[in-house]
Swiss-Prot record:
The lineage of its organism: Bacteria, Pseudomonadati, Acidobacteriota, Terriglobia, Bryobacterales. GO terms for molecular function: rRNA binding; structural constituent of ribosome. GO terms for biological process: translation. One of the primary rRNA binding proteins, it binds directly to 16S rRNA where it helps nucleate assembly of the platform of the 30S subunit by binding and bridging several RNA helices of the 16S rRNA. Forms an intersubunit bridge (bridge B4) with the 23S rRNA of the 50S subunit in the ribosome. PROSITE patterns: RIBOSOMAL_S15. This is Small ribosomal subunit protein uS15. Keywords: Ribonucleoprotein, Ribosomal protein, RNA-binding, rRNA-binding. One of its GO terms (cellular component) is cytosolic small ribosomal subunit. SMART domains: Ribosomal_S15. Signal peptide: none annotated. Belongs to the universal ribosomal protein uS15 family. Transmembrane segments: none annotated. SUPFAM superfamilies: S15/NS1 RNA-binding domain (SSF47060). Coiled coil: none annotated.
Amino acid sequence: MALAIEAKRQILTGNQRHKTDTGSPEVQIALLSTRITMLTEHFKTHKKDHGSRKGLLTLVAKRRRLLTYLRDTDPERYKAVLLKLGIRR
């Protein structure tokens, strides 16, 4: 499931470090978290969609790697991202 352009733009503006930032870990984690939430809602009605479930696990693993990178490089930004996005870790 892809994000709509407006939804993606809204996520970007809320998590950018500067005006043209699209690749910082904070932005990537926020985008992945939104996609994970969308897929989780999808699975509430489509329990046997195993192909998409594999995609969900891939997204969760990618977000986990980005969070680990952010924790190791800048713990303050890491804590801020966890609080802002409500991620339990």
